[in-house]
């Protein structure tokens, strides 16, 4: 397996000259910015000493505010205060309305179906909102470092798809930032812990943030970080704990009107405060909307237990994908503020059979890892031997004849990666080829996900199988896919970059993987049948062309035998008997052997006509 050296040519800094770089943890609930100073990675605080920046933006006609100031307006001006925008990244409006029906914002759809949020500052998309958060973080870094940033590394959940990753990059560019790389959040945490403590072996990174959950199984060895498998849920996090507790408080308080956005915000604020308090106390008193009551940690644990169980199921799947057992995991790294919840730490410890690591602040560990990576990529550590491997979550491939999927890059392949396969034409004189890019684990197109289509035109008109088309799949370090098709004799090519308008949920990814295992035997049989049908069609197509050109080489009796064999093959190819189709193909081959030999002799005679033996 190839390893990726994380240092780019041309970026090495001059002696005694350091470039300014930052790592940004663009979180659902809170965001942070970190940098490396005097050889140590540290998060940067605001003027009041606060390291976290709430991922909240409040919009007004004359401007906007970000962070704590914006969050104070959430209850007063809910419609213009955008929070948890990370959940909206790369999703269509229909998808958002289905997933998050209780959002207090008014939406409109853009021409391509993407969401536009109605605010006092006008219609804004999630990319713009994210850009405003990034600008605030960049301003903090610029002031702390007394200079403009040369580049940033921004972290994203491991399960972010192409559209979500591209949206993050677009937001950074809109904020005026040079993106060195997008980095998976669990991988960033592994960098922070791997470099600080020099561990080797298999570790699990359990990342439960405000809005997303990721589990990564990594192997650390001599500065090499290899992601063995990933899993998670992009719609599960501490926010869900908050909403469950808010609903519980609402029921206890007898507050019926859920549509009152202001009351809902007060309930949510009370729930957040109670959750934090219950991490350190056995019970907490809650005051909201004129109601006062007490909530115990036991009650809170009962509410969130099903969600914690969901995270552990994802852990089990990731371990299976990685091919390791829980007792092989040497350490468990806890990432994200929600891992402070005692029940989470307790259940994770029980699952892996060891207390999880919490020596680095779980809120800061991702930003610290991103800062270390940014410092290397910007050229401040040209001698670094650190390597980093990420993986793709689902296999990538192409549709081939018969509705089959030919996998080009298997799932859990490390990225960046480039793989190529050669394909050919099916029919005589074929001058174009449709390239259908697929994603999934099943054998048939109907059971996989369509990513993109494009056409390669200008193929030389040759007999079937005469043209050779090389299709190259390239996944870059940010997980974005480019597909290029090139006809090898002419050099004509076409390509596409996959940027779906919205992506799969993590539960859908898990379901696709599960289905591939459940239907493995059935899929293999279906593939064998489809392949035989394609071969039958190819044989009949070739035979039809040969008869049209050289039927005169056959006697009437010989022609009848061949026609009967072809008719039988055509008939059985409509059925589902793989063996019968295979035998019928062999019979056609047998009955046409003499015909093929005569055609070859005739071609040779034509080629030699008019030439002497000496010329040959």
UniProtKB/Swiss-Prot annotation:
SUPFAM superfamilies: Actin-like ATPase domain, Heat shock protein 70kD (HSP70), C-terminal subdomain, Heat shock protein 70kD (HSP70), peptide-binding domain. GO terms for biological process: iron-sulfur cluster assembly. The keyword Nucleotide-binding applies. Gene3D superfamilies: 1.20.1270.10, 3.30.420.40, Actin, Chain A, domain 4, Substrate Binding Domain Of DNAk, Chain A, domain 1. Pfam families: HSP70 (PF00012). Belongs to the heat shock protein 70 family. Chaperone involved in the maturation of iron-sulfur cluster-containing proteins. Has a low intrinsic ATPase activity which is markedly stimulated by HscB. Involved in the maturation of IscU. This is Chaperone protein HscA. It comes from Escherichia coli O139:H28 (strain E24377A / ETEC).
């Amino acid at each position: 397996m190839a390893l990726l050296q994380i240092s780019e040519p041309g970026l090495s800094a001059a002696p005694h000259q350091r470039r300014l770089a930052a790592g940004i943890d663009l979180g659902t609930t809170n965001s942070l910015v970190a940098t490396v100073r005097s050889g140590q990675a540290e998060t940067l605080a605001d003027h009041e000493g606060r390291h976290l920046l709430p991922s909240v933006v409040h919009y007004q006609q004359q401007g906007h505010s970000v962070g704590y100031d914006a969050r104070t307006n959430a209850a007063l001006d809910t419609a213009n205060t955008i929070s948890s925008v990370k959940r909206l990244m790369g999703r269509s409006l229909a998808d958002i309305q289905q997933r998050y029906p209780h959002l207090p914002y008014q939406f409109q759809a853009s021409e391509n179906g993407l969401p536009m949020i109605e605010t006092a500052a006008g219609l804004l998309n999630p990319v713009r909102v994210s850009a405003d958060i990034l600008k605030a973080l960049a301003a903090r870094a610029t002031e702390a470092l007394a200079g403009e940033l040369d580049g940033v590394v921004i972290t994203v959940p491991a399960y972010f798809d192409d559209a979500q990753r591209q949206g993050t990059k677009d937001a950074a560019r809109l904020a005026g930032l040079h993106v060195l790389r997008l980095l998976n959040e669990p991988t960033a945490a592994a960098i922070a812990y791997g470099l600080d403590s020099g561990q080797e072996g298999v570790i699990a990174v359990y990342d439960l943030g405000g809005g997303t959950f990721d589990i990564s199984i990594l192997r650390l060895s001599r500065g090499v970080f290899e992601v063995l498998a990933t899993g998670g849920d992009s719609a599960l996090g501490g926010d869900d704990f908050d909403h469950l507790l808010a609903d519980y408080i609402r029921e206890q308080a007898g507050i019926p009107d859920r549509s009152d956005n202001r009351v809902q915000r007060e309930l949510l604020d009370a729930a957040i405060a109670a959750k934090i308090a219950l991490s350190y106390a056995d019970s907490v008193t809650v005051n909201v909307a004129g109601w006062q009551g007490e909530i115990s940690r036991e009650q809170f644990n009962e509410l969130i237990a099903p969600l914690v169980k969901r995270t552990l199921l994802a852990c089990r799947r990731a371990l299976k994908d990685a091919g390791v057992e829980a007792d092989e995991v040497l350490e468990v790294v806890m990432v994200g503020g929600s891992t402070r919840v005692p029940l989470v730490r307790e259940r994770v410890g029980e699952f892996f059979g060891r207390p999880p690591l919490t020596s680095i602040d779980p809120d800061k560990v991702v930003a610290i890892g991103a800062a270390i990576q940014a410092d290397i990529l910007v050229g401040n550590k040209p001698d670094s031997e650190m390597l980093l491997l990420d993986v793709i979550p689902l296999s990538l491939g192409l549709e081939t004849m018969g509705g089959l999927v030919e996998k080009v890059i298997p799932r859990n392949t490390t990225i960046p990666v480039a793989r190529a396969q050669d394909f050919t034409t099916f029919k005589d004189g074929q001058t174009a080829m449709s390239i259908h890019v697929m994603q999934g684990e099943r054998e048939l197109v109907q059971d996989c996900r369509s990513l993109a289509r494009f056409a390669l035109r200008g193929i030389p008109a040759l007999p079937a199988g005469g043209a050779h088309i090389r299709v190259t799949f390239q996944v870059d370090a940010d997980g974005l896919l480019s597909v290029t098709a090139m006809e090898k004799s002419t050099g004509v090519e076409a390509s596409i970059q996959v940027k779906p308008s919205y992506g799969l949920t993590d539960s859908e990814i898990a379901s696709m993987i599960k289905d591939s295992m459940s239907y493995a035997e059935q899929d293999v049989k279906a593939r064998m049948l489809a392949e035989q049908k394609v071969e039958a069609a190819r044989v009949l197509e070739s035979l039809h062309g040969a008869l049209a050109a050289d039927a005169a080489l056959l006697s009437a009796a010989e022609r009848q035998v061949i026609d009967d064999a072809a008719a039988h093959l055509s008939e059985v190819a409509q059925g589902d008997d793989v063996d019968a189709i295979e035998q019928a193909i062999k019979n056609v081959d047998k009955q046409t052997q003499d015909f093929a030999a005569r055609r070859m002799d005739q071609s040779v005679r034509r080629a030699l006509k008019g030439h002497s033996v000496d010329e040959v």
